[in-house]
Structures are given as C-alpha cells and as structure tokens.
C-alpha cells in the first residue's frame, strides 16, 4: 500500500517537474530580453537538479548527488557571469593591478 503511494508520488513529481522544465525552456527560447533568458536558465537548472534528485531516490543511489552539485556550480557561475556581462558589458574586471 505504501509502495503504491510512493510510486504515485514519484511519478506525479516527475510529471510536474517535466512540465516546469518545458515552461522554462519555452521562456529560454522566446524570452524577449537577456535577463528573461538568464532567469529561465537558472530556473531550468533548478528543475533539472530536482529531476536528478528524484531519479536518485528511484534508483536508490547516492552517485547522482555529485551531478546535482556539479549542475549547481555550473549554474551559479554562468548566472553570475551573464549578469556581470549584462551589467558591465564584460565578465572580467580589467582594472586591477598586480602586486609584486
């Protein structure tokens, strides 16, 4: 009985995450501004991390958690880089001097 509820919960979670990912990808493609695309990319990476987490529960394996961490790091770095590019026009600051 409990296994049936668990299976229904996992399947419904995957369906909801799939619909959320579809909405995020539509906004990523059609987004009128770059900021919309950055936000939708960040949201879609969070949805992908959630899907991988559910798959980790399904397969009863902790090896998927490393990929969740990798997706989170790549998403954070890319969001910060694109936001700096939108704000300043460049990713790296070239106004620093080297100390010798």
From Swiss-Prot:
The reply to whether Cell membrane figures as a keyword in the UniProt entry is yes
Keyword Thylakoid: yes or no? Answer: no
Keyword annotations of the record:
Antiport, Cell membrane, Ion transport, Membrane, Transmembrane, Transmembrane helix, Transport
UniProt membrane topology term: Multi-pass membrane protein
Gene Ontology cellular-component annotations: plasma membrane
User: Where are its TM segments located?
Assistant: 5-25, 38-60, 65-87
Which Pfam families is this protein grouped with? MrpF_PhaF
Matching entries from InterPro entries are given as: MrpF/PhaF-like (IPR007208)
- Which subcellular locations apply to this protein? Cell membrane
* A GO MF term: sodium:proton antiporter activity
Sequence similarity? Belongs to the CPA3 antiporters (TC 2.A.63) subunit F family.
The subunit field of the Swiss-Prot or TrEMBL record says: May form a heterooligomeric complex that consists of seven subunits: mnhA2, mnhB2, mnhC2, mnhD2, mnhE2, mnhF2 and mnhG2.
* Name listed for the protein in its UniProt record: Putative antiporter subunit mnhF2
Instruction: Specify the species.
Output: Staphylococcus epidermidis (strain ATCC 35984 / DSM 28319 / BCRC 17069 / CCUG 31568 / BM 3577 / RP62A)
Q: Which lineage ranks, top first, belong to the organism behind this chain?
A: Bacteria, Bacillati, Bacillota, Bacilli, Bacillales
User: Its gene?
Assistant: mnhF2
